Amino acid sequence: MAKGIMLHEVGEQVDQYLLIKSSTKGIASNGKPFLTLMLQDQSGDIEAKLWDAKQSDEVTYAPQTIVKVVGDVHHYRGRTQLKLRNIRPVSEQENVNIDDFLETAPIPKNEMMDTITQYIFEMKNPNIQRITRFLVKKHEAEFMDYPAATKNHHEFVSGLAYHVVSMLNLAKAIADLYPSLDRDLLYAGVILHDLGKVKELSGPVSTSYTVEGNLLGHISIMVTELSKAAEELQIDSEEVLILQHLILSHHGKAEWGSPKPPMVKEAEILHYIDNLDAKMNMMDRALERVKPGEYTERVFALENRSFYKPTFHK
């Protein structure tokens, strides 16, 4: 089995199959077109440039294409890149499966679904419980498969469910410490806050934004979904309004994508939990790629900072 692409060190040669995660056209300083390819396997992804790209290359090397590459790992402007020597699409005879290149959550789907179901079962408010159960059941297949984002955090198969399970465990610990919090409301907010991403995003492979995702966004999508669920379940109570507020405010500020700031205690905590879990995932993934005594690449979503791995962290 080939070494994972993220396990290669600078200076090593790569000769293996990879999946094109994304392909972006650019124009070099000499006026010639090139493609920026994000190539992935189950260990992560790496950027590569295809210089002097022909128009036909945009089709040949489109996202979701499996390719055989030969190249060298090197550093360029603080980032690890793959310098291509050769690249070609695979043939059917090579019998390579796209699933073999997809990074997945570290917890099996059935275990994550069991955890989410248990948190719903523990809810005591019937209105909150019914709405949450209804929406999870409606979108269960996508909920268990989709990533939480196209980049930055939990951007892998089942990343959305993994993000939610981690947040639920954080929510439980915080609610144990602060008993004045409404557990039902907080748990429901965690489970539903990003569920609109099953319509905002295209799916778990070469994830991009749908038309609905670009024009509306997952927050607006989920507020509408909540309203429809309440109507179908004939629930007309303040719980619906408060759940909608938790969805609307979970990004915290207008400049971060929330139409309203948190104005309910559980909404404030939801925002912190979401932010904490996303940032922990970003840091963990960046630090996995370096040895003790080294700095990570700059993490754009964390104010473009680098993080140091202490020498005593093996």
From Swiss-Prot:
PROSITE patterns: HD (PS51831)
UniProt cross-references to CDD domains, sorted A to Z: HDc, YhaM_OBF_like
MF terms (GO), sorted A to Z: 3'-5'-RNA exonuclease activity; DNA binding
Signal peptide residue numbers: none
Protein origin, superkingdom: Bacteria
Positions of the DNA-binding region: 22-90
Record family assignment: Belongs to the YhaM family.
Designated name of the protein: 3'-5' exoribonuclease YhaM
Organism: Bacillus subtilis (strain 168)
